[in-house]
């Protein structure tokens, strides 16, 4: 990262990182006189400065220069980019509150997960760092440890006991913090299938997320069969709180779902996917042909442009059939191209169009 390069370079040069800038994306054939000319104009707002050095970045095939500010400067007036040879040169600097902002974002993330910075150190069993020391720990170390937790191990990022499940009650009048049954069921199913923890612990975490009638049902099924698995509990929840529509109804509802007027194709596909998954759960549509059925329904039920229709037809004929996410990627790419085209059209000034028309008329005459 550019900020990391700035910090390391400042350490080597023995200068204050808070009073230094990196200018990146400079063409390699741009000499120091040219760089000085550009910076003299662009950095008038910072007062006096000096160019400390230039290095070559092989991966980008560009040059980077380090600039030291000689006066106390309000960093908010420093431009984030300057116009130089070859295009835009980016200006990188570190604001005094940058570390504080990182810690605030990290603490907010951990708070949502029911965790603390000290708890994360204990969970990672980081050697040489006491749980009492995290407030004094650098943001760089915290970022490293958080990434370490995401990369290593099969368990969740944080200790499972701190992972909050969504709330579900099954009540007719749901509280604001509650989730619909399908959303809650998705997370509960993930716990049942993927979390490497004992069945008793899984059932306890599921039970902690329940309120009202849903919690009553959990107590009933456990009383009937104390050794019941989480998966069997969830099957009972599907029977009581899940959709009651028949297999045939779910199939027909899916096949008769079309793109609505004014609805983007990507929004239609997302809406369609919910119905497809429900039909698969009801065994109205075989799971092994879900990708084929999805693609066929999109081609039949959406108002596709010629380019997108041809792309989807090619996928259908030549394969492999796209998954839901792969299909969404193709559709979003096409939508973005269309949006860019229409935006370009809307930017054309009426005078330009009239001028073009007059020029055509003069040619005809």
UniProtKB/Swiss-Prot annotation:
Q: Where is it located? A: Nucleus, Nucleolus
Q: In which tissues is it expressed?
A: Expressed in the cerebrum, cerebellum and testis.
UniProt GO cellular component terms = nucleolus
Give the source's domain of life in one word.
Answer: Eukaryota
Mind listing the UniProt keywords for this protein, alphabetically?
A: Acetylation, Nucleus
Span list, region Disordered? 336-365
Spans through the membrane: none
| Family statement | Belongs to the PNMA family.
**PANTHER family with a match to the protein in the record:** PARANEOPLASTIC ANTIGEN, PARANEOPLASTIC ANTIGEN MA2
This protein is called: Paraneoplastic antigen Ma2 homolog
Q: Which organism is it from?
A: Mus musculus
């Amino acid at each position: 990262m550019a900020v990391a390069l700035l910090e390391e370079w400042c350490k080597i040069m023995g200068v204050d990182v808070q009073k230094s800038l990196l200018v990146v994306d400079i063409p390699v054939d741009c000499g120091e006189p040219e760089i000085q000319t550009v910076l003299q104009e662009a950095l008038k707002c910072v007062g006096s400065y000096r160019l400390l050095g230039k290095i070559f970045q092989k991966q980008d095939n560009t040059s980077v220069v380090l600039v030291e500010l000689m006066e106390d400067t309000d960093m908010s007036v420093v431009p984030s980019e300057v116009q130089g040879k070859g295009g835009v040169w980016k200006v990188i600097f570190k604001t005094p509150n940058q570390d504080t902002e990182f810690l605030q974002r990290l603490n907010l993330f951990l708070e949502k997960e029911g965790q603390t910075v000290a708890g994360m150190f204990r969970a990672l069993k980081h050697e040489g760092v006491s749980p009492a020391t995290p407030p004094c720990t650098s943001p760089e170390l915290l970022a490293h440890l958080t990434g370490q937790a995401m990369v290593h191990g099969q368990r969740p990022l944080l200790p499972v006991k701190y992972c909050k499940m969504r709330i579900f009650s099954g009540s007719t009048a749901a509280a604001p913090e509650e989730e619909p049954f399908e959303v809650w069921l998705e997370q509960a199913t993930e716990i049942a299938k993927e979390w490497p923890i004992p069945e008793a612990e899984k059932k306890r975490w599921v039970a902690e997320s329940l309120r009202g009638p849903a919690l009553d049902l959990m107590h009933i099924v456990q009383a009937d069969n104390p050794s019941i698995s989480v998966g069997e509990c969830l099957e009972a929840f599907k029977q009581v709180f899940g959709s009651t529509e028949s297999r045939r109804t779910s199939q027909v509802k899916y096949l008769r779902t079309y793109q609505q007027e004014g609805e983007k194709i990507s929004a239609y596909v997302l809406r369609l996917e919910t119905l497809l998954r429900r039909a698969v759960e009801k065994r109205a549509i075989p799971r092994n042909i879900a990708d084929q059925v999805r693609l066929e329904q999109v081609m039949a039920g959406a108002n596709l442009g010629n380019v997108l229709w041809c792309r989807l037809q090619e996928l259908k004929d030549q394969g492999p059939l796209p998954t839901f996410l792969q299909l969404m990627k193709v559709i979003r790419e096409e939508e973005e191209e269309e949006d860019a085209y229409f935006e370009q059209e809307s930017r054309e000034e009426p005078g330009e169009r009239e001028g073009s028309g007059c020029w055509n008329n003069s040619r005809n005459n």
